[in-house]
Amino acid sequence: MSDYNTGGPPPGPPPPAGGGGGAAGAGGGPPPGPPGAGDRGGGGPGGGGPGGGGASGGPSQPPGGGGPGIRKDAFADAVQRARQIAAKIGGDAATTVNNNTPDFGFGGQKRQLEDGDQPDSKKLASQGDSIGSQLGPIHPPPRTSMTEEYRVPDGMVGLIIGRGGEQINKIQQDSGCKVQISPDSGGLPERSVSLTGAPESVQKAKMMLDDIVSRGRGGPPGQFHDNANGGQNGTVQEIMIPAGKAGLVIGKGGETIKQLQERAGVKMILIQDGSQNTNVDKPLRIIGDPYKVQQACEMVMDILRERDQGGFGDRNEYGSRVGGGIDVPVPRHSVGVVIGRSGEMIKKIQNDAGVRIQFKQDDGTGPEKIAHIMGPPDRCEHAARIINDLLQSLRSGPPGPPGAPGMPPGGRGRGRGQGNWGPPGGEMTFSIPTHKCGLVIGRGGENVKAINQQTGAFVEISRQLPPNGDPNFKLFVIRGSPQQIDHAKQLIEEKIEGPLCPVGPGPGGPGPAGPMGPFNPGPFNQGPPGAPPHAGGPPPHQYPPQGWGNTYPQWQPPAPHDPNKAAAAATDPNAAWAAYYSHYYQQPPGPVPGPAPAPAAPPAQGEPPQPPPTGQSDYTKAWEEYYKKIGQQPQQPGAPPQQDYTKAWEEYYKKQAQVATGGGPGAPPGSQPDYSAAWAEYYRQQAAYYGQTPGPGGPQPPPTQQGQQQASGNCHPPPPPFSFQPPATVHPALVGSAGNPFPCGVCP
């Protein structure tokens, strides 16, 4: 062990495992350093001389040098003072000193500072950060947070949120403000947005929201709330809405206030405070141009006055009032007629009534579509009346095709196959192969819905089986006007890539039990061709449809019933459709003035067409053809054989022609014959035939086939008059014992 100076104390004890520093030299240095942590013994600083090294001590410090121990002790003192100050300020929040560590709990950090070859400045900076992190929670920096309610247009909420919330997330990230949008507007045109954050963050978020709304409206960025406050050219006016009537102005789902804003071109805000009593009047703020604001105020007051009068919101004979308008239900198959070709009809209704009409969008499955009429109440009712008149004219419908054999011709076409009432114009039933039904219906019914919307017709699958019961086919029904049915038929044929097979009669044909149409002349026209409906009576007058129904073809009297054509129409549905459309689309325009002569029978197959009659009509050929057809029909069992009166009728007409021209025997030239007796006999026979008191005669004859007159005293049809005049006098050679021409041997 080395010698010490005379003035120095004896050396300290050797440090364990590599010794500590020696004692301070003469001159009185500070206490020796702590024990060495490694195999090296740190020499303590000496004022008068170097300290003694340990057994394996490290190198001694130079004389008078200040080693790291001085700086570390000073730093530890500063930390201790800081902790004392923190304890005085924070009380129990101050951090306690761990007595298990040598120097104020920083023994664990000694190796971090001592080990390594980093400069001392980095070591101190790292230690300062550690101290600051421990002292940081004691004094958090002051931060001001606020929450503000902001309003944006309800229609712009989707634009503010963005796809997948992208836009609202960008607003929150860029502004540092939390943005929350209320889930519902409560019927108001604006949606509440909650902004939470620092004042500058909230202000930035508001600016970003204004920019998005302004861009969505097509205006310059940042102009939304400036315009909402009226701007330089705008006017803001508030009117008080009485308690309990705020919902009337707002409407269901905000529909009424939206319509008012659209019609007046203003912005309306109903100020509602949740803390207010429901019995308190609420202000309605109207923003816009002065003239428009005044007009909007009048519209709102009109709504409130109608409510006071009890007329608003009630349902009338035309539909339901909603938001100052009227909803009129229109059958789906009649929508195309109300709209008209290229919208001509609905434009005409709008111009005449001074309203606006729109059909509401729906799923296309219901039987009706809603036409919403917007405008003043009296004009809305006028437009609704026009639409209902048009629908009423549709219910009478165009004439249908001929019915079954022996049935009267079709009347006005609303009769279905079962005789019940249906849509105007009737319906069409057709069969489609089962494996192609999916092409018509589509996934979820989307194809049939599209067909209904495009054509205005109503297409549905029938639950009835095909007539032959074939399970490989399904029946479909199309209801609507002829134009709508044709359009829907064309679209369906494109889907299945083939023609449709109609089943049953065409639209408007009366069923087996269907009543006769209002224009059917009655049983008198069931006789042979050439006879007038009522002998000597004028034809039915032709009145064009009045009002809004004049867009449809005018009704013409039906042609004489032809049994062969009726049988062909019953067996071939296509023939019935062809006759129906030819009658519907090719009618001669305008009524025919004056009594028209009875139509002649169509020429038989293979015969040339007859020239138009001039002067006195000759029905000889028509009667011959009629009796030939009657003779071809099968006789009923037990009925007496029919006789051929063709020659007798020819002779009869020849003599009648002579009488009419004044060449008959006993007729003075130029004198008008007297038909009184002939008319009396004719009406007596008609009364006896139709169940009234029969004239004197023998027993009733047995029933004969349809089309043959069968009554006592009138077993054969009376001779048809010329130009609606009865025969003058029957020739004695042609008169039977009872005054009837051509006695059959059954009648007396």
From Swiss-Prot:
Glycyl lysine isopeptide (Lys-Gly) (interchain with G-Cter in SUMO2) crosslink site(s): 122
UniProt keyword annotations, A-Z: Acetylation, Cytoplasm, DNA-binding, Isopeptide bond, Methylation, mRNA processing, mRNA splicing, mRNA transport, Nucleus, Phosphoprotein, Repeat, RNA-binding, Transcription, Transcription regulation, Transport, Ubl conjugation
Example GO molecular function: mRNA binding
CDD domains: KH-I_FUBP2_rpt1, KH-I_FUBP2_rpt2, KH-I_FUBP2_rpt3, KH-I_FUBP2_rpt4
Gene3D superfamilies: K Homology domain, type 1
InterPro entries given in the database record: FUBP_C (IPR015096), KH-I_FUBP2_rpt1 (IPR047372), KH-I_FUBP2_rpt2 (IPR047369), KH-I_FUBP2_rpt3 (IPR047370), KH-I_FUBP2_rpt4 (IPR047371), KH_dom (IPR004087), KH_dom_type_1 (IPR004088), KH_dom_type_1_sf (IPR036612)
Keyword Acyltransferase: no
Residues with PTM N6-acetyllysine: 88
Annotated Pro residues bias: 8-17, 398-408, 502-521, 529-543, 588-614
Region of interest (4 X 12 AA imperfect repeats), residue spans: 572-685
Skewed-composition ranges (Gly residues): 18-28, 36-69, 409-422
Any GO BP: mRNA transport
Renumbered ranges of Sequence repeats: 572-583, 618-629, 644-655, 674-685
Positions with biased composition (Basic and acidic residues): 111-123
GO CC, one annotated term: cytosol
Sequence similarity: Belongs to the KHSRP family.
Name of this protein: Far upstream element-binding protein 2
Organism of provenance: Mus musculus
